[in-house]
A protein has these predicted regions:
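Mid-domain Rossmann-like dinucleotide-binding core that forms the NAD(H)/NADP(H) cofactor-binding site
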Residues: 121-200, 204
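Receiver (REC) domain switch-region micro-motif
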Residues: 94, 149, 214, 218
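Glycine-rich beta-strand-centered segment in the early N-terminal region that forms part
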Residues: 4-19, 31-98
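C-terminal hydrophobic helical "lid"/dimerization subdomain
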Residues: 201, 230-234, 238, 277, ...
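Residue-level marker of beta-strand positions
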Residues: 92-93, 105, 136, 148, ...
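A structural motif shared across PLP-dependent enzymes of the aminotransferase-like
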Residues: 98-110
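Short, glycine/polar-rich helix-capping loops at beta-to-alpha or helix-loop-helix junctions
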Residues: 101-104, 178-185, 251-257
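Glycine-rich cofactor phosphate-binding loops and adjacent beta1-alpha1 units
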Residues: 141-144, 189-267
């Protein structure tokens, strides 16, 4: 194998562990995710279809994989410190914030990786981007002591957000998902109520639990076609908080913003990394201080994850995109 020559600010990383992001499953299917794509393709374009001009927002958008970590084995001549501070050394264990991690070795700019904190295991540190994003979201979702919280979507990130609500002193925490296995994890983590949205209307169930008042904080961690976002809006109480984590890929054509105005809702963007590079790094370091202190139960996350080898990746995507809404495991881990 011939490894590429490094530019001055680049490093070569040997992969220890990567993982699959939920968004990549949609991209793999060629799902049309941006309003501008739909406009370009015309009124006939629907979620899950490529525009007529063949410019689908499809997978891969770039080099394969953006979750993972490994060991720095070579450095460019201009590499001195990480963005945000800290000397860079050969042998450092690092987590990735961007492509390309679905490979044995990868080259990236030093701005796009961060050292795994000393108090965090290698395996947990290789979840740097997804875990950091979820932990930061849990810190900024707006939970207060005594709140009633609903987490709509309890996959990997949703179950981190759910733990954040419990640790923050919520009086009731409601977990919602279409997959019973994920709800079982949420229950084991301490959810007071679990609602299987494939069996009952989750909005009606929340209304019954809250005696018609709604929840103080509605967390949207489903993403996808936007149904979870509409449900979260229908669950939140007057003057409540709508905390948006999931990436909703399709335009929501019938969506009334009047409730935001009339009910004085607090709307929070819980995406940690779509900011300036330095601010994104600050968010991740803030999140990992909490991870390093053992606030979250991560053992149960790994217990309910699945592991594959890198050469099995094509089969992984074929299998996991067959039923996008029924993914049973919390995280799919890829080993070189």
């Amino acid at each position: 194998m011939t490894l590429p020559a490094l530019k001055p600010t680049q490093v070569l990383v040997k992969t220890h562990q990567a993982s699959v992001c939920g968004s990549e499953r949609y991209f793999y299917r060629g799902i049309n995710v941006r309003p501008q794509d739909e406009a370009r393709g015309g009124s006939e374009v629907q979620l899950g279809e490529a525009p007529a001009d063949s410019h689908a927002h499809a997978y891969p958008m770039g080099p394969l994989g953006h979750e993972g970590g490994g060991e720095i084995v070579e450095m460019g001549s201009g590499v001195e410190e990480y963005l945000g501070g800290g000397a860079v050394r050969i042998g450092d264990r690092v987590g990735s914030l961007i492509y390309p991690t679905f490979t044995d070795y990868w080259v990236t700019d030093i701005r796009h990786i961060q050292p795994i904190p000393a108090g965090v295991s290698y395996e947990v540190g290789c979840l740097y981007e997804p875990l950091g994003c979820a932990a930061w979201a849990a810190l900024h979702a707006g939970y207060k002591l005594g709140d009633v919280v609903a987490v709509n979507g309890v996959g990997f990130a949703g179950n981190i957000l759910l733990q954040g609500a419990i640790k923050s002193g919520a009086s009731k925490v409601i977990a919602i998902d279409m997959v019973q296995a994920k709800l079982d994890v949420a229950k084991a983590l301490g959810a007071d109520y679990v609602i299987n949205a494939s069996e009952v209307d989750p909005v009606a169930a929340v209304e019954e639990i809250t005696k018609g008042e709604g929840v103080d904080v509605a967390v949207e961690a489903v993403g996808g076609a936007g149904a979870g976002l509409v449900q979260a809006l229908d669950m939140v109480a007057h003057n409540g908080t709508l905390a948006l984590y999931g990436d909703n890929y399709a335009p929501i054509k019938e969506f009334c913003f009047h409730r935001f105005h009339e009910d004085g809702l607090d709307v929070r963007n819980l995406n940690a990394v779509h900011y300036t590079p330095l601010r994104s790094i600050e968010h991740m370091r803030e999140a990992y201080r909490v991870v390093e202190r053992g606030v979250f139960d991560l053992d149960i996350i790994f217990k309910h994850s699945v592991t594959y080898r890198l050469d099995e990746l094509p089969t992984v995507f074929q299998n996991e995109t067959a039923h996008l809404e029924q993914q049973g495991s919390l995280k799919t881990i890829i080993l070189p």
